[in-house]
Regions:
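S-adenosyl-L-methionine
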Residues: 1-39
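Mobile active-site "lid"/loop adjacent to the S-adenosyl-L-methionine
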Residues: 19-26, 35-65
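Helix-to-beta-strand junctions that scaffold the AdoMet/dcAdoMet cofactor pocket
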Residues: 70-72
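Active-site-proximal loop/turn and secondary-structure-junction residues that shape catalytic pockets
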Residues: 1, 44, 82
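Active-site-proximal flexible loops/turns
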Residues: 5, 48-50, 87-89
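Generic hydrophobic alpha-helical scaffold/packing signal
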Residues: 3-7, 36-39, 56, 60-67, ...
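C-terminal catalytic and target-recognition region of SAM-dependent MTase-like enzymes
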Residues: 23, 34, 61, 75-156
């Protein structure tokens, strides 16, 4: 309700899509629609250390499909709430997903748990929340942008 009121006040167009199956929005590599912003808030796939490998694969697949749904220059907002997935593993998984999707990611913001969520030293509690905002570019367009910047630098 809050979101709807904000959208109406700002006269913005926002469409929400809730899906437990990201393949409903793609048919293999064919994407049916591109979005300016895609937000992922998946459940904790790794409830135990034993489930970590499968969980990382699931997070990778989900993020890979999401990256394909973002317009070039749009944003992917993604998160992970599994305490068994560390920050480095989270970023490595996203890097692998981006490579497989043919995308480049530019991290705009990263957050962990808020101040009201305690981090207990010596116990793996409190560091499970990972949240990141990325600008998503196709590898081809990113190369073009870099080439243009080099030309602009040469004229200075």
């Amino acid at each position: 309700d809050f979101l709807r009121k904000q959208v109406q006040m700002n006269k913005e167009y926002i469409e929400q899509l809730h899906s437990k199956n990201s393949s409903k929005r793609t048919n293999g590599d064919k994407v049916f629609r591109l979005w300016d912003v895609v937000i992922l808030n998946p459940p904790a796939f790794a409830k135990s250390q034993k489930e970590l490998k499968h969980a990382l694969r699931s997070y990778k697949d989900l993020n890979l499909h999401a990256m394909k749904l973002v317009v070039d220059g749009g944003f992917l907002i993604t998160s992970c709430s599994s305490r068994h997935v560390g920050f480095d593993q989270f970023l490595n998984m996203l890097e692998a997903a981006a490579a497989d999707a043919g995308k480049l990611l530019r991290m705009v913001n990263y957050r962990g748990a808020g101040e009201d969520y305690p981090h207990l030293i010596g116990v793996n509690i409190g560091n499970e929340l990972k949240f990141a905002v990325f600008e998503v570019r196709s590898r081809k367009s990113a190369a073009s942008v870099l080439q243009q910047r080099k030309k602009e630098e040469a004229y200075k």
